[in-house]
Amino acid sequence: MMTVRLIAHTPEPEKVVAAAANLCYSDAHITDLLDGLDEEKTAKFLTMLSDLGHASPIEHASFTFGIEGVSRTLLAQITRHRIASFSVQSQRYVRLDDFRYVVPPEIEAIPEAKAAFIESMNEDAKRYLDLAHKLEEGHTARLMAEGMPEKQARAKAGKQANEDARFVLPNACETKMVVTMNARSLQNFFHLRCCSRAQWEIRQLAEEMFKLVYPVAPHIFAKSGPACVSGPCPEGKMCCGKTAEVRAKYAAIKEGAAV
């Protein structure tokens, strides 16, 4: 099951962004700029930035998420967003004795497909652990023959075994990560991944991340969400045709966060 937490962010992110942007047009000291910003002035300045398309100051605010219960399929997608920092559970150093996996909703909804999927996952887990064991025994024997003490040999052999045994693991295999993005990167991430055409799992993640950051920085993320929230759908013939519904959905999310 996917879980997402906002574990850290820039203190007073909107005030920091407003001060950074204000500095571009002022000869005042930074401390004076910060002290001169109340909530109303900050909101006004951020709205002006958005209207002008002056986005670089937004990069001064960053947000760090703890993400668990997602698949390696999602990992391959989220790391395409290159202006971000990722720390991911290693399949090289962590042996997956407790093999967990993500079941896609469309498979979950069809009993026969779900049964076949679970059977496949169980077989994959068995093959993975069997291969890891065989590799570990083989590496241990070789290292001990080379004169390494057994305890040290087994520790080294275990890591070597994990490195190659992971090749049989499926994309459904669960992983966990810590991800940090600046606000501008998040705006782009939401623009692309909250869209109904995004793959279901990363769309679910993007929506959860949006729900977490919006209450912290509502003016920065006022126009965030899929592209159609703040303008016409850019998908052309591939448009889902549900722009009004999507806008209503994100309006409700923002309204709920403001309560």
Cite the ranges covered by each PLM segment.
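Family-specific signature for flavin-dependent thymidylate synthase
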Residues: 1-259
